[in-house]
Every structure is written in C-alpha cells, then in structure tokens.
C-alpha cells in the first residue's frame, strides 16, 4: 500500500514536471534565436533598438512548434545594403531575413499578436529575424 502511494505521487510529480519543463525548454530555444541575432555584429550606421522572441504555432498550417527571434534596428543603410550584409551570416534560407518595419506589429507572425514596444514613427526601421529549431520530440509536446 505504501509503495503504491509513493509510486502514484512520483508519477504525478513527473507529469507535472513535463507540463512545466517542455514549455520552458521551447521558450529557451526561441530565446537562443533572439540571442544569436543580438550577438551578430551590426553594420555601420545601425543601432539595435529592441529584441524579441516567441515560440508556438506562429505561421502556416499543420502542427508543430516554431521558434522565432527578431531584432528591431534603426539604420541609415538601405534594405538592399542590409540584406547584403546579413546574407553573409545566413546558413539557411530561414535565418537573418531583413524587412522594413512599419509600426510596432510584427507582420510575419500570422497566428499570434507579437509587437515591439518601441514606437516607430519614421523611416529607417528594419526587422531582422530568424526561425530556429530545437529538439524535434520536445517541440511536438508543448502544452
């Protein structure tokens, strides 16, 4: 009787730990994407304004977990110059993507509302973003 009770308590603790640890791990994966962007040297005439990350089903159809990281930069360089600069850091087609940022809302995120806190009132703001990956088993288990 005592062993059954202890085994039951252990099982409950393991299940509760999974409910906490899997989302924490997935958020950590998204944070690593953000960190990678922040640690990348900025081009000249460019300043880092803000960084953000998000995990979840963010775009497209089907299931699965997506890890998104982005930085908001203000630059005197053109979009083409920034794309050329960041293309040197790309290891695949989902990293270091550059777009003009108008307003606070991040438009590449379809299924969640994600926005920068910085008010964007004029031109010269760009978003540099990457889609990351993590352990394929845990990304399917986010609760």
Where are these regions (language model features)?
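An acidic-aromatic pocket/loop used at catalytic or ligand-binding sites
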Residues: 2-69, 74-143
């Amino acid at each position: 009787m005592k062993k059954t009770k202890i085994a039951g308590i252990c099982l409950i603790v393991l299940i509760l730990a999974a409910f906490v640890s899997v989302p924490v791990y997935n958020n950590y994966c998204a944070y690593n994407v953000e960190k990678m962007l922040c640690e990348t040297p900025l081009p000249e005439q460019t300043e880092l304004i803000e960084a953000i990350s998000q995990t979840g089903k963010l775009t497209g159809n089907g299931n699965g977990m997506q890890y998104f990281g982005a930085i908001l930069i203000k630059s005197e360089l053109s979009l083409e110059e920034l794309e050329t600069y960041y293309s040197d850091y790309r290891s695949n087609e989902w990293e270091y993507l550059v777009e003009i940022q108008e307003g606070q809302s991040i438009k590449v995120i379809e299924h969640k509302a994600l926005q920068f806190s910085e008010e964007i009132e004029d031109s010269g703001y760009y978003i540099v973003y990457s889609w990351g990956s993590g352990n394929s088993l845990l990304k399917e288990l986010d609760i």
